[in-house]
Amino acid sequence: VLFHGYQGSAETMLMIGYLFNHDFGFNVLIPDLRGHGQSEPSAISMGWTERTEVVDWIRTADSLFGGNTQIVLYGVSMGAATTMIAAAEESLPACVRCAVEDCGYTSTRDIFADSWEKQCRLPLFPLFHLSDLWCRILYGWSFAKASPLDAVHRCRLPMLFIHGDKDSVVPVEMVHRLYEAKIGDKELWILSGVDHGAAYLHDPQIYAQRVRTFVEHWFECPAILEQ
């Protein structure tokens, strides 16, 4: 089950979908997250509310593909953040064997603060804090709540972390924090000279080999979540 990034859609994931389907032999489900693509207009929560929808999509995939499936979660950017948060949910179905996150961020607060300082060149206080308060009042979630960093502290699912060391959107230091915080089985792959979301295009063959090796290893361990 594959998840796109902010302002993306299922269509923007077709190359990765082709990789998993044609090259790896997987059935693939690529949904439009809330407020994106053909989904109904809705407030985007950078992974927090979306996490429950991920669980629903997993159950849908399990049903569509026979009810006795093994599932890998894959996400890019906001989709990666959503994947990490969902992977720590207690309601995550046991059919999920592993997850791959590509260029996800530590928390909505961190990525918004970093972008704010880069683009606005204004102090965080008070406008940033007022924006956070507005989200709390209007939508019921805060920037700090949507936190993959907190989620991976609780996540037992094997996870592959992918990031470019020249990422201009999500600083590479964030993936190091995520990797260090992740409990259980994990792998970290830093690509030299690669910008945000460009890891696959940088070298499709190496990318495919690395992802496939990780995923197939955990598909050989069907009882990983029961350990």
What kind of feature is each model-predicted range?
Residues 85-144, 150:
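Hydrolase active-site cap/lid region
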Residues 6-20:
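The serine-hydrolase catalytic nucleophile loop
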Residues 44-65:
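Alpha/beta-hydrolase active-site loop
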Residues 201-227:
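Catalytic active-site module of serine/aspartate enzymes centered on a nucleophile-bearing elbow/loop
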Residues 17-40:
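Conserved alpha/beta-hydrolase
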Residues 179-198, 204:
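Catalytic histidine neighborhood in serine/cysteine hydrolases
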Residues 154-156, 161-163, 167:
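Short beta-strand/loop motif that positions the catalytic acidic residue
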Residues 16, 148, 157, 171-180:
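Short alpha-helix in the alpha/beta-hydrolase fold that links the catalytic acid
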